[in-house]
């Protein structure tokens, strides 16, 4: 659409029915691998990478198209939209802070050992890692840009365990995540484990499906 308008000589802001529209490209890919170890015991792994770039009319992608991380289907030690971008951490006294915790680039990995307990009840031990980043510097969100220098420290890490009840056509899932490392610095913690307390490192989630 923007290309057609360019051919027609419209070199300024692009509009559709009188409204300016967003211009961006976005893509993501997800890889999953399952391996039966023995009996009803499985090793399941997942890797996801996604990126987006705004251009033309837009300086940023629409909010609904930006990446976020955390929650029942992500890094389970952290609730949804409480990580990133990068090492940025919004003011904790701002109830709307989670609006700022989105990014242009997402990297996430999960590995899970699934085992049968009894009947249709299964258990799982898992580890999750990842974060989101900005591809452009944002003065309002310092530390949010993806850089090679801070990449390792920016990766959030969590572990945990859960229960799965398999009713043949649906799986009910409960997970308790335990945070091991957050991307934002904690002046009271010097080592890799930098959660303020064990209680604050916990995340509980209920979900349907794997």
List the predicted regions and their residue ranges.
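C-terminal outer-membrane beta-barrel translocator/porin domains of Gram-negative envelope proteins
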Residues: 1-115, 126-145
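Outer-membrane beta-barrel domain signature, especially the mid-to-C-terminal portions
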Residues: 5-8, 138-156, 187-197
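Residue-level signature of outer-membrane beta-barrel architecture
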Residues: 33-35, 113-115, 165-167, 176-178, ...
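Repeated loop/turn-to-beta-strand initiation elements of outer-membrane beta-barrel proteins
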Residues: 38-43, 119-123, 165-173
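Flexible, small/polar- and glycine-enriched "cap/hinge" segments at structural transition points
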Residues: 128-130, 135, 160, 164, ...
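Outer-membrane beta-barrel "beta-signal"
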Residues: 165-170, 196-210
């Amino acid at each position: 659409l923007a290309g057609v308008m360019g051919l027609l000589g419209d070199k300024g802001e692009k509009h559709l029915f009188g409204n300016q529209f967003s211009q961006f490209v976005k893509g993501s890919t997800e890889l999953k691998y399952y391996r039966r170890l023995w009996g009803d015991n499985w090793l399941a792994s997942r890797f996801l990478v996604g990126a987006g770039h705004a251009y033309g009319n837009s300086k940023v992608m629409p909010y609904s198209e930006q990446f976020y991380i955390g929650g029942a289907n992500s890094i389970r030690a952290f609730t949804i939209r409480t990580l990133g971008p990068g090492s940025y951490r919004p003011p904790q006294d701002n109830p709307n802070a989670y609006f700022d915790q989105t990014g242009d680039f997402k990297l996430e990995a999960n590995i899970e050992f699934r085992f049968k307990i009894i009947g249709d009840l299964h258990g799982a031990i898992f580890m999750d890692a990842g974060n989101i980043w900005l591809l452009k510097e944002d003065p309002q969100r310092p530390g949010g840009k993806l850089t090679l220098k801070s990449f390792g420290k920016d990766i959030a890490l969590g572990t945990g365990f859960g229960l799965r009840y398999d009713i043949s056509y649906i799986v009910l899932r409960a997970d308790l995540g335990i945070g091991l490392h957050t991307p934002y610095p904690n002046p009271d913690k010097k080592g890799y484990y930098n959660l303020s307390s064990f209680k604050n490192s916990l995340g509980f989630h209920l979900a349907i499906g794997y």
